[in-house]
Amino acid sequence: GFKWIANVMRENEGKARYLGGGEESYGFLAEDFVRDKDSVSAISLMAEIAAWAKDKGLNMTDMLIDIYMKYGFSREKGISLVRKGKSGAEEIIALMKQFRENPPKEIAGSPVVTVKDFQSLVETNVATGETKKLDMPATSNVLQYYTADRTKVSVRPSGTEPKIKFYIEVHDTLASADEYKATEARADEKINRIAKEFGITK
């Protein structure tokens, strides 16, 4: 969460320019004079963006599509599996062990090229077997798989609830605004396919 964003800010004070930091639960930190999630600054920025867009005859979705066309389309979905009780906790432990010891060789037809294990702080190049240490301030029970087509799947148990969480991120190109809906639908279909590959069923 934000304690780690603030930690990186402290380490880089006077060395680099801070642009912004956020987490998957929608918190955002826009300025470096606050060291925690800052809804006041974030909503002020959103209002300014909306006003700028309106002045140009656009809306915020139009602006997002322009970004996708320039930098590439990206879509992420978080899926949580609830596994309650003692048997549920044991199942979550077993799933993490299985994913750690037997990582997928491909995801949605694209070969896995990199595996990051934030518990051992080791990044593995799947093709060469070469490993390197991840530069992180602490360990965490998180696994990440990256494929050749830039798909990323992250897996971790919740620290506060009886859940195992999956974050699936896919990428595509967007040539024109007219293709946005079709690209979005294609990304959603791919995410659902990946979820099935990982055995994610409610």
Indicate where each model-derived feature is located:
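Phosphate-binding and adjacent anionic-ligand microenvironments
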Residues: 1-156, 174-180, 184-202
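Short, well-ordered beta-strand elements
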Residues: 153-155, 164-170
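A generic beta-sheet turn/junction motif
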Residues: 159-161
